[in-house]
UniProtKB/Swiss-Prot annotation:
This is 3-hydroxy-5-phosphonooxypentane-2,4-dione thiolase. Pfam families: DeoC. Involved in the degradation of phospho-AI-2, thereby terminating induction of the lsr operon and closing the AI-2 signaling cycle. Catalyzes the transfer of an acetyl moiety from 3-hydroxy-5-phosphonooxypentane-2,4-dione to CoA to form glycerone phosphate and acetyl-CoA. Its EC number is 2.3.1.245. Keywords: Cytoplasm, Schiff base, Transferase. The gene is lsrF. PANTHER family: 3-HYDROXY-5-PHOSPHONOOXYPENTANE-2,4-DIONE THIOLASE, FRUCTOSE-BISPHOSPHATE ALDOLASE CLASS 1. It comes from Salmonella typhimurium (strain LT2 / SGSC1412 / ATCC 700720). The active site is at K203 (schiff-base intermediate with substrate). It catalyses: dihydroxyacetone phosphate + acetyl-CoA = 3-hydroxy-2,4-dioxopentyl phosphate + CoA. Homodecamer. NCBIfam families: PRK08227.1. Its main location: cytoplasm.
């Protein structure tokens, strides 16, 4: 407690200078509460307003797929190079060292597998557990046009409402129904619906034609999914084109941890996202870093 015997009147009020407060100028976040903006400022670099997320949540429906057999051996060495980790609470508690001190986007939907209809998901994490785990956001699929579209949208709404109560951003992940074309028209629809429901971040796929229209029509930040494994040069070109056309980052898994050299690859992706390197320059970096 302060010593009450030596209280002095303050003198340095700088009355000639108006009070300032630096805004976190992220797309669509100007009206959000301080706590939610603070979490978003950990996900998106405040200087570049971009992010490189490392996704290794695939096991929630795929099991121990290639590259994720041992998270502690294959994925843990990548943690220090990622801006954000995207994983399930089971892996977070059992494998991720708390001292790594990286922001976490927590997978919060599930209850399906590759053996069944993928769109049939439920909310799989209570919001108080996401807070308990010090998550910076929670993520769930939204399957527009699928058999279980209605339930997936309800899942997102449930998480958004719970997130608003505690200052937790929600990332809506646009899953694709079996019979849906992966084109600009579909992803414009899916991303806009998720944003209209109140999601603060949208994860979607890059498309070669019209991606700039998807990004422009979405009022909150978009990060692109890496999708299936591509040759490194092609994956870096996809990153470059997405960022150039309005994406706010990437959320990559297989194109990093299934790479010939995952550390070199995540460094190359970082160069594209945060330093505007071309795919050609980034690929040269990958080759030079490749062990």
């Amino acid at each position: 407690m302060a010593d009450l015997d030596d209280i002095k009147d303050g003198k340095d009020f700088h009355t000639d200078k108006p009070q300032t407060n630096t805004l976190f100028a992220l797309k669509g976040c100007g009206a959000l509460d301080w706590g939610m903006q603070s979490r978003l400022a950990r996900i998106f670099n405040p200087k570049t307003r971009k992010t490189v997320m490392l996704a290794f949540d695939h096991g929630y429906f795929q099991g121990p797929t290639t590259g994720l057999e041992r998270i502690d051996i294959n994925i843990a060495p990548l943690f220090e190079y990622a801006d954000v980790l995207m994983c399930t609470r089971g892996i977070l508690r059992s494998v991720v060292p708390p001292a790594i001190n990286k922001p976490v986007v927590l997978r919060a939907s599930g209850a399906n597998s590759i053996l069944t209809e993928l769109s049939n998901e439920a909310v799989a994490v209570a919001m108080d557990d996401a807070v308990r785990l010090n998550s910076c956001a929670a993520a769930a699929q939204v399957y527009i046009g699928s058999e279980h579209e209605h339930q997936s949208i309800k899942n997102i709404i449930q998480l958004i409402d719970a997130g608003l109560r505690v200052g937790m951003p929600i990332m809506a992940v646009t899953g694709v129904g079996k019979d849906m074309a992966r084109d600009q028209r579909y992803f414009s629809l899916a991303t806009r619906i998720a944003a209209e429901m109140g999601a603060q971040i949208i994860k979607t796929y890059y498309v070669d034609k019209g991606f700039e229209r998807i990004a422009a029509g979405c009022p909150v930040p978009i990060v692109i999914a890496g999708g299936k494994k591509l040759p490194e040069r092609e994956a870096l070109e996809m990153c470059y084109q997405a960022i150039d056309q309005g994406a706010s980052g990437v959320d990559m898994g297989r194109n990093i941890f299934q790479s010939e050299d995952p550390v070199a690859m995540i460094k190359a992706v970082h160069a594209v996202v945060h330093h505007n390197e071309t795919a050609e320059r980034a690929y040269e970096l990958f080759l030079s870093e490749k062990s």
